[in-house]
Swiss-Prot record:
The gene is ileS. This is Isoleucine--tRNA ligase. The keyword Protein biosynthesis applies. Its cofactor is Zn(2+). It comes from the Bacteria. It catalyses: tRNA(Ile) + L-isoleucine + ATP = L-isoleucyl-tRNA(Ile) + AMP + diphosphate. Binds 1 zinc ion per subunit. InterPro entries: aa-tRNA-synth_I_CS, aa-tRNA-synth_Ia, Anticodon_Ile_BEm, Ile-tRNA-ligase, Ile-tRNA-ligase_type1, Ile-tRNA_ligase, M/V/L/I-tRNA-synth_anticd-bd, Rossmann-like_a/b/a_fold. A motif ('KMSKS' region) lies at residues 599-603. The keyword Nucleotide-binding applies. Catalyzes the attachment of isoleucine to tRNA(Ile). As IleRS can inadvertently accommodate and process structurally similar amino acids such as valine, to avoid such errors it has two additional distinct tRNA(Ile)-dependent editing activities. One activity is designated as 'pretransfer' editing and involves the hydrolysis of activated Val-AMP. The other activity is designated 'posttransfer' editing and involves deacylation of mischarged Val-tRNA(Ile).
Amino acid sequence: MSDYKDTLNLPKTSFSMKGNLANKEPMILNKWEKQGIYKKIREHFAGREKFVLHDGPPYANGSIHVGHAVNKILKDIIIKSKTLSGYDAPFTPTWDCHGLPIELQVEKKHGKAGQSISEDDFRKECRKYAKKQVEIQKKDFKRLGVLGDWEQPYLTINFDYEANMIRTLAKIIENGHLSKGFKPVHWCTDCGSALAEAEVEYADKVSPAIDVKFKIKDKDKLAQAFGLDSLNHDAFAIIWTTTPWTLPANQAIAVNNQLNYSLIKIEDFYIILAENLVEQTLKRYAIENAQIIATTTGNKLTGIIAEHPFYSRHVPILHGDHVTDDSGTGLVHTAPTHGVDDFTLGKEHNLSMEIFVKGNGCYSENTKLFAGEFIFKANDRIIELLGEKKRLMNSDKIKHSYPHCWRHKTPLMFRATPQWFISMEKQGLRDKALQAIKETSWAPSWGQARIEGMVKDRPDWCISRQRTWGVPLPLFIHKETEELHPNTIEILHKVAEKIEKDGIEAWFNADDCEFITETAQYKSVKDTLDVWFDSGSSSMCILDLDKRLSYPADLYLEGSDQHRGWFQTSLLVAMSAKGSQPYKEVFTHGFVVDEHGRKMSKSLGNVTSPQDIYNTLGADILRLWTASTDYKSEMAVSDQILKRTADTYRRLRNTARFLLSNLDGFNPVTDIIEFDKLVKLDQWAIAKTKEFQDKIIEAYDKYQTHTVAQLIHHFCSIEMGSFYLDIIKDRQYTAKTDGHPRKSAQTAIYHIVHALVRWMAPILSFTANEIWDATPKTTDLPIQLCEWYTGLKSFDQDAELDLEYWAKIQEIRSEVNRVLEIKRNEDVIKASLEAEITIYADKYNYKLLEKLGNELRFLLISSKADLKVIEESTSSSIAANIPGLLIEITKIEEPKCERCWHRSSTVGDNPQYKDICSRCVENITTEAGESREFA
């Protein structure tokens, strides 16, 4: 037996079978750094149509988590796909660097500002800490393969950014959107500051739920309201509340003029309840012997005076539109300094706005009985006092959704304080914002309704904070009238100039006289700006000013929580400062959860860190998982899910390796064969690749990365692995090295690789780089500078063997494979090359298959394939799952060719080559080798 190994075209490539990504990727990153790849991309695509994806700034505090990784990877995929489409698509990373979380970290080390450390030094430490965190996060983002202008990121602590925030504020004031107000705002006692809507989280909380008796002072007036002559017992208005601590601030009881109210006799006193709530309220009190005396409307009750349950204070009953009979008692306890509706009612009726609670959550000195106590701890004492005063009708507990601080996770309170607001009503900002939302494209589509609902219902935006580490609110107000200085706009521009030179310290360390001369009449505001104003200003501070970018951005892409966060604050800043929305399109992705749909937490032990993933599996696995997951809903990740992703990656890598290994010796300059002269199956492969490329580009354009990933996987595993590559192995390995059949397949493979590597590049950035390095090509450009491959061709409309024809052949082949498997299991054959396949076909299928002539066997990977009319079928034939088709498999008895392994009667016909078939002899001995037309 001879050794024919040297006569075969064995696969050969520098592209390794094993990814070894965790070790290779850092080396590839290093190469990109040395090449200055991002700069080269910018230079190469300069002058092209721009596509700007504006990066929402992550907070510079702590290592990135998998949610951060998902966000940056999705952005990177989109940017790279747009670059492939020929756009100049820059990516400038941003970071949010002011605010409470950084303050807290610095406090842990240095103590509170103004106590253990000066405020000036505290700010310096905050800036130092933020910069350090940026470098940590930057390193992680770069390790993920994310390309961007990492050397010139936008940080909200950059002096020019801080200055441009002040200039943005000046525009907002100039446009008439700023107002000062004494209003209830969400207040965190731990922060010692007001919070914006976006900083409020809702979580379940168990609270006391009490019904309190307010004694009616004028019984005769109450009797008259109910149409009675008189009342012979005391009467009480009953309110229900889950915040007993607000009772010291009670100034009124609210009813609704349109609701009906009942007077109910219980033993020796009367109570007032909304008519529709009587039954459920009495049931809650476990009272069965109550008697409804009379009913009246709310408007008859207004003006009646009650007595505070534990203070010597008169409490009027007033009408409030916000009062309903859905729950509680239908009478609402009103503390104007601790609720929005309460405050509105208080202003309308000139109720006392006395402050009873300080910023630290303790009652002020003027709070009788409870001065100095922490409000939430005082609940029990207040309930106890109500009991002693016989003013407690009922006491219970309730579990309900309650606002908490996004950072401290502690319950918030509503507290009226003097603050600065961007008014939603002045200059029609709310209506303008709602119109801008309609003019923006939202995906998923429900995002539009979500943000519309939030903007419709949101209060004025409180932009002032009582913090140390933040951009100042550098205003001057009159010491008596508290009106803004008449030259506020000019002053703000002067402040901005100084900050641009020396940072925010230029304001905090300056004397008022550096900015104004009327220091006797005006004082400076000591507040800082809400950190959401920092990030919300990015469209004005970056897009509107950086000539490398453009306003509005083409795309904002963030997590779905940003409808109430950055999407909204960006919109409000842009609309109030510039009068137009900052984005054309807004996409959101879901949160990352574990495989059971649970939020990730250290306590559950289900945290998957991006660092662990890229240090073990490689960043490309994380990128592939991100792209493969439909990010419009929650994104599940776990070790098991990543293992499945790694399996998918291996299939893709193996496909790429097979393709590359069969391009050994191929010169694209001299060896390319024209489409019309290719073997028909190779024509199909190119046309099929073109069909997939069109779908893939469309999916990329719609940001449907999971569709892209599915298409690439299907292409590699089904169209290539299970069909085309399976069939051409024989031709590639055994045909004449320089013969037409092999060069035809290599031409197709060349086109396929050039398309496939580009499809992969936005997602599998490191692997695509490897593939590109191992690919024969006619360009020196790195893959990052390439555009979509244009060397593919579709079939002409009149092509006889078009995609539809080959799809039918694939169906028939699948049925043959099914029957082959049956015969393998029956031990009739061990491999398909041992099989003689006979297909019995009706007229339609016969006509399809006869076009392939004697090359049908190559498509079926058998040594012999016969086509016969269905009427000749035998009892041993098996019906296919295709009408008009039967298949018969028998074992072929002819000898095996030691070179191609086909069974052939021609083995030994040539005395010089006794153990190979005539086809192999032809491929070894003749100049042209065998010929192929179809497969």
